[in-house]
């Protein structure tokens, strides 16, 4: 089996990948993550996932490189990482009582052959109606400023959800393991 490399510095993705009990290393790619004019949210996350994997190919020949990227979509608007309390507060106020779809782009690049599998896995959450007090309590407790849409689903963020719909709950955290296992199997990698 070619060595696995996770093209990410995300602790959340690292924890998810470790669930497969396969040895892997991590390396953070340096790419421009800007949204291109006219680019759909699906095209954006697929492109960024592949670019993250390809950015490490020359320095990691003969590896299986996993790239992933996620955005949240509210209506027609892409909402990314808020980075600040005020932006997170506004994102959650906007999402109150609405449906938010998380799109997670996933790429598995065989840097030996150049073959790359790319997909996008959606996961929808229906938000509870949230007031400012609840939002601020959540933000102070969780500080989800590095999470798309200000939702930290692996923590208290799940308390903001009324219901969820999707084929792979791990995609909500940023690495869709069910789809990744399919891709790994296509490369001849069996999970324990």
Swiss-Prot record:
Coiled coil: none annotated. Its EC number is 3.6.1.-. It comes from the Bacteria. One of its GO terms (cellular component) is cytoplasm. Its cofactor is a divalent metal cation. The record marks 12, 70, 154 as: Important for substrate specificity. One of its GO terms (molecular function) is nucleoside triphosphate diphosphatase activity. One of its GO terms (biological process) is nucleotide metabolic process. Signal peptide: none annotated. The active site is at 69 (proton acceptor). InterPro entries: ITPase-like_fam, Maf-like. It catalyses: N(7)-methyl-GTP + H2O = N(7)-methyl-GMP + diphosphate + H(+). PANTHER family: 7-METHYL-GTP PYROPHOSPHATASE, BIFUNCTIONAL DTTP/UTP PYROPHOSPHATASE/METHYLTRANSFERASE PROTEIN-RELATED. Nucleoside triphosphate pyrophosphatase that hydrolyzes 7-methyl-GTP (m(7)GTP). May have a dual role in cell division arrest and in preventing the incorporation of modified nucleotides into cellular nucleic acids. Belongs to the Maf family. YceF subfamily. This is 7-methyl-GTP pyrophosphatase. It comes from Pseudomonas fluorescens (strain ATCC BAA-477 / NRRL B-23932 / Pf-5).
